Amino acid sequence: MVDNVSLKPGLRSAWGLSILVDLPSIKMLFDVGPSFDLLLSNAEALSLNLSELEAVFISHMHADHVGALNGLLAYNPKLKVYLPDPKLKLAFVRSGFEAECLEEPAQIAEGVYATGVLRGAIDEQMLLIQAEGKTVMLTGCTHPGIKEALEAAIKASPTNSVYAVIGGLHIGSASEALDAWAYMREVGVAVISPCHCTSPLAKSMLAKLFAEGYVENGVGCEIRLNNI
């Protein structure tokens, strides 16, 4: 929905992230990007009706991930919002919206789980999707670190494992990419689809290391979980 790389004509790119999660149990957004105008423009280009969304999961409170939230809530006020900040949760509730802060691992819908908030310099939470007996981790920027994020995800996952990682990895250099790949390989990650704050150099390195397990990502990318 939103990324700094667009893969299809007619879709706008911008620094930020938003991923549509469309499952039988729930239709939701993982992050919302920097502006509602951008989000709505890409949704319309993709023939997606934002009023059909049931929930929004915010990984962390940086503007490039949460900037569109107020506009989206004005457009679709029935949304349930999962926030990493309990104080903001109270503010949203007082404004009449349904909001929740999941400090600990929890199930959101059938096959959908939250890792709980990883506290640190930048508080962040990851979303887990279980499909075909495999767990996929969605990550906004992985500010806590890929090791810490995966440890939390493995703990929260019904499979006690993570098969695929999709999202921003906050990796810039080749050495960081190599270290991340080594750890992901160690814990059993077989598929990766990096975007947003993952540098072009890191993407290129990860593409070589993961080989057939690498999936190009960007606005317009569609990943069917039963095919990975």
Identify the function of each model-found stretch:
Residues 29-32, 53-61, 82-85, 137-141, ...:
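Active-site neighborhood of phospho(di)ester-bond hydrolases with catalytic His/Asp-centered motifs
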Residues 68, 135, 141-223:
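Cap/insert and terminal regions of metallo-dependent hydrolase folds
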Residues 27-28, 55, 79-80, 111-113, ...:
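Structural motif
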Residues 37-82, 157-165, 185, 190:
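Active-site metal-binding motif and surrounding structural segment of the metallo-beta-lactamase
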Residues 33-36, 118-120, 142-143, 171:
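Short glycine-enriched loops at secondary-structure junctions
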Residues 1-45, 124-139:
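Conserved beta-strand hairpin/beta-sheet module of binuclear metal-dependent hydrolase folds
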